[in-house]
């Protein structure tokens, strides 16, 4: 029997239409409209994006204000802000300027509804922005204990993640004392789409600000303490190239992300965190602490910068018992250590808002990102090393030590520095550096003559060059300072000479596929249904 091709073609079209295929097919190969971000489930799963993208890094107090201003002023279409608190009047002034210069700019603001330290400032900002014509919402009070996240989405292609709020102590004026904070800017549509999906979900569940119900707060103040901090990291880092990017959110993936970082460490693990709490509660923080101790036990050199807050006595004792050095953030130049970051082997870095409390990890909304890129990680590592060298080391008998480079190779001379600033108010009689190569005997070197200026410009740092050692060698160092007949002996630390470090663990990865492959993935089931319908039609025609 001869089949009418016209009828067969019509049958195919009808089958495709029934299967829901024709309209998507037309859209796929026609002009693409601007992509609309879909409202997604609250379960934001772990995704790693392999991207070739641009990244900008900056820190507070050094260059944070200039960089944030630059990116906000660069917005052409939209700015969406999801943040715990705002008390910086200069940021509010900038938004007013943007409103005047770019009146069509789409801006939304999602603020923490019960943010500690920010209830009145947040109400004032919410009322001010509402009067300016922008929509403002509170995060849903039943979703999280605190909405402690700090991220910004610009033009649906750039995401900024902060450890700090939009506060005077996070984005200070020149010459003002402020917190140590890390921030990162990621320019990539796919990565930003992930953050936008979180924003859309939280925004959709948010509560509209109402001045009558919520109040109007108190005007923001411009006061701040002066500082002599020289801002050595005022220049932002600019990086472009391939990198793995993993967005991190509480309560969804924060614990997974923190443990991934710590468990990935093979040579060095550097952690900067405001505090530890929930110690001994058998919760998320205990898992983090256990992972840190396990890293030390498997041969990783661990450093921790924190503050004498919350469970600091407990964590100090735990770390001392396991040979892990901890310093307290310098407060001569900084108001506080408000950073929440991890650097692993100088090649992976976590920038986030996540504190080490069970609530922050499992009950808050928090936001961050893991970047696997050596250049980016090394930029933050330089700042960590700076903070390490000026930290209060009373937990280590007031004697601190470190070296450069962090992970030397077999061809690298190693410069070891003893930091004596805690004891410098008294004349030092002797500074000694103990060195043990591998499992050999200790050698002790007097370095009282090898003195140079500390970061604060005082003659209180002592150094010794160690010759290069074979790949795989572990060099143990221990600094000692004598004042009169009293010796102050620091903790032993291990320099790990490595020409290479093993690859990182594999994670669930999202990559970009070509248009045809993505089309087949999205619509393959409909194509199959259409083909089946055509075959059935042919069989039916033959039977007739």
Model-predicted segments: where are they?
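Low-complexity, Pro/Thr/Ser/Gly/Ala-rich linker/spacer regions in secreted
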Residues: 29-41, 390-402, 409, 496-519
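A recurrent domain-boundary module in secreted/ectodomain proteins
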Residues: 197-205, 370-395, 495-504
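Short, glycine-rich nucleotide/cofactor-binding loops
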Residues: 81-88, 276-283
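HKD-type phospholipase D/PLD-like phosphodiesterase module
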Residues: 29-74, 85-263, 290, 298-374
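Secretory targeting signatures
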Residues: 1-37, 418-420, 433, 479, ...
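Charged helix-capping and loop-helix junction motifs
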Residues: 284-290
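Glycan-association/targeting regions that enable binding to alpha-glucans and other polysaccharides
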Residues: 394-505
